């Protein structure tokens, strides 16, 4: 059984080799290394650093279901379910009803997971100060690169905490939840954001676009700059964010994957579209026993496939989302399968089983439509899913840059609309022309370019038809993100950050007294709740309030 310790690694290999022949971060098993040993050689320092990278993976030996399914739980719930395009039954259905409470296990585990990583980073950074420059092959430059990666990891986890919970306790170098169990929340969100920016800016300054030693899976300049830009966007400093994103676009190594449908595929690791991912590799053993040798595994298929065909708790997709695509937008066929359609990777027909034929299924009447981003084979074959968790793609960089252009240049920004056009050209298949699909790809590539409807004209009419009141560019970005990032890691956060959450829900999922069919007879989401702006942040976990003497119920986020 693996142990979890600040100076210990818990996996046999975090990243291995891909078809391009590039190297990946390789993490071997090591025994506990005490600080007095850790900082006697560069190899030992890197072993300690690799222990920080371990915090991005699930904890297969954890006592909590959420620890074992990290990167699916709680991520899908936090970043998707409240927007209602993705829906859940069972214990997670409360997110679809906007009825979550502070004692929800997901909040507790998310908080603990993040602070476990931050505590490791703080201890590592405090000890790194004492390391002699002479032990590093590149001298001070080498030491700075180690510090940059550790600070970026800490900055990432504080970003994760801030976007979910707002103001949080800011533990600094040397502080952990063991030696600093009671610390109040930051005085302001700006204090939290500025700390994150400091960490990520330092990382961007000292790291390159290509990961250190060519080990894909390590923090890069592009990853640090992308999350730094997002933090500036939360601060409404779109000028600073825009400059960072423009630098990434002009100088970074990133490109859009020509076919949208080839992103979420077995063995697609660190393509040029990937800015930050957690790679789940195609190990020789992906059977039930795989969790005895690595944490680098997840149940992507089992946790998203239709229950009709072996899924444990399907990732249901709303009827509204399924109807929301323009003709020709291939993201629809690449992302979901609906009632009456054939799952393209398994040949299974949705709704072919007696009792599962309806628009809604199960005791909670969930929509009979499903995401296929992680459902690329029959449930159980293999048990674990060798598809990466793409936390940040280049497509997000482009759309974030578009948002900053509109915010700083106005609604007619040609640069902003050009980024949206690029995303839509890929969505309609124009980047597929002249290329061959990967092996066993169940869709045909476009053979000639087609004319994509002008985004500004389309969304001008869409805005009127749906009843939006925000600027056309805001509506365009919202719906493009909706279609681009279904069941990924950003949509609800983007809605909240851009102040579009209420408007999106009112226009796409209006309250309807719990009806399952609209006035046109189409199946729809039964929405009864009223929008509460307090729900744009999640609650400080009940356990934290009970155990942290510096935080009381009076410090809880409003509305909880």
Name the predicted role of every residue range.
Residues 46, 50, 54-62, 85-165, ...:
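Conserved, well-structured interaction surfaces
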Residues 1-29:
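Bacterial Sec-dependent N-terminal signal peptides
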Residues 21-91, 168, 193, 201-202, ...:
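An aromatic- and glycine-enriched ligand-binding surface/loop that stacks and positions planar moieties
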Residues 19-24, 65, 70-73, 86, ...:
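Long, intrinsically disordered, low-complexity segments
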